[in-house]
């Protein structure tokens, strides 16, 4: 039996929507948001009405009768650490997301948007494999200072979806494979997947690992400490330098990799330097994850929107293909993964979890 399910994936620079009937896509649309459109909002929660209007416009444009929906699923946001799986959206979850209790990110709006529409229709709302899925081995949590532990915050949904898809193409189970998977998008996360579990991964949100189009990644600690006490920036402004205005925005004033590539191909020295450095840092993180797996790596998988860039992925391949084969799985299977999780629950093949 198949079910009509709306999937909602709010990202830092886009809102992605699709309606599925079973595993068939009835329609899918990605709405891109420019920096100018989002500049008027002081925080993610202020974007709720804007994203809600985007959702309603897309549904109306496709002429889909929302009363046919049997469930709504949103991308999971920053919650307390949880096991992988499909979760019913609860009031406790909504409260934590509205308060940004565990951090602020556009994905926090996924459950809020899903529940608003689902409640209007009196149908269930879910999230699947949120970014806080935590499967890290204990040694990976040790940071180097006893008062700080490393956290698992990454693009779990797309990592898992890409891992399962490639494993299936190789005729094996994801749970029996060792992969290094790199999600390349507005944020970048690189994880060591050992037999179905992401046992080590950089915190792709809060300043850890490679820099990305809009995030700073790891920074020299003492220099950042000096900035914190310089009096030039507030705490919020410093946080924005790490999460929303770091990386390529900091170096080139844009988070559009299409613009960056155009500058690279035009011979812009600053653009070439930043572009090469980002590929270098991703490659270095892939190498580190290969060590976590003790060199027993079945494949390196490059996924996410930036994996569509042949110029960017070629630079990573050149630096990492001595480890093992590099497989490009461009784009994101996140909407499909959200739908699959809910279809399994609605069909009674899997039980939903409670937050």
Swiss-Prot record:
Its main location: cytoplasm. GO terms for biological process: acetate metabolic process. Belongs to the acetokinase family. Disulfide bonds: none annotated. It is an enzyme of class 2 (transferase). The gene is buk. One of its GO terms (molecular function) is butyrate kinase activity. HAMAP family: Butyrate_kinase (MF_00542). It catalyses: butanoate + ATP = butanoyl phosphate + ADP. It comes from the Bacteria. This is Probable butyrate kinase. One of its GO terms (cellular component) is cytoplasm. SUPFAM superfamilies: Actin-like ATPase domain (SSF53067). InterPro entries: Aliphatic_acid_kin_short-chain, Aliphatic_acid_kinase_CS, ATPase_NBD, Butyrate_kin. Pfam families: Acetate_kinase. It is found in: Cytoplasm. Keywords: ATP-binding, Cytoplasm, Kinase, Nucleotide-binding, Transferase.
């Amino acid at each position: 039996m198949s079910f009509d399910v709306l999937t909602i994936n709010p990202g830092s620079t886009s809102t992605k929507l699709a309606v599925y009937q079973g595993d068939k896509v009835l329609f899918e649309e990605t709405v891109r948001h420019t920096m100018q459109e989002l500049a008027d909002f002081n925080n993610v929660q202020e974007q709720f009405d804007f994203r809600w209007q985007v959702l309603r416009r897309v549904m109306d444009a496709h002429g889909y009768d929302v009363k046919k929906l049997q469930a709504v699923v949103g991308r999971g946001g920053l919650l307390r650490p949880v096991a992988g799986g499909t979760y019913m959206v609860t009031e406790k979850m909504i409260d934590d997301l509205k308060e940004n209790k565990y951090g602020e990110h556009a994905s926090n709006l996924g459950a809020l948007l899903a529940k608003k529409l689902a409640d209007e229709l009196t149908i269930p709302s879910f999230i699947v494999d949120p970014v806080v899925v935590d499967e890290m081995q204990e040694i990976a949590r040790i940071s180097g200072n006893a008062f700080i532990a490393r956290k698992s915050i990454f693009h779990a949904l797309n990592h898992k979806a890409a891992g399962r898809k490639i494993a299936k193409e190789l005729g094996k189970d994801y749970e029996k494979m060792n992969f290094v998977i790199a999600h390349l998008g507005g944020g970048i996360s690189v994880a060591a997947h050992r037999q179905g579990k992401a046992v080590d991964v950089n915190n792709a949100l809060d300043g850890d690992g490679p820099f990305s189009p809009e995030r700073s990644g790891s920074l020299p600690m003492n220099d950042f400490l000096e900035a914190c006490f310089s009096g030039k920036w507030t705490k919020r402004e410093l946080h924005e330098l790490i999460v929303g205005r770091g990386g390529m925005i900091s170096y080139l004033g844009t988070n559009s990799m299409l613009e960056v590539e155009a500058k690279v191909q035009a011979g812009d020295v600053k653009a070439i330097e930043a572009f090469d450095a980002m590929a270098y840092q991703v490659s270095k993180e892939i190498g580190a994850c290969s060590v976590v797996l003790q060199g027993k790596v079945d494949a390196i998988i490059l996924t996410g929107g930036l994996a569509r860039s042949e110029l960017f992925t070629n630079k990573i391949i050149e630096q990492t293909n001595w480890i093992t084969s590099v497989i490009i799985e461009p784009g994101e299977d996140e909407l499909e993964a959200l739908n699959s999780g809910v279809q399994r629950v609605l069909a009674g093949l899997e039980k939903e979890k409670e937050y």
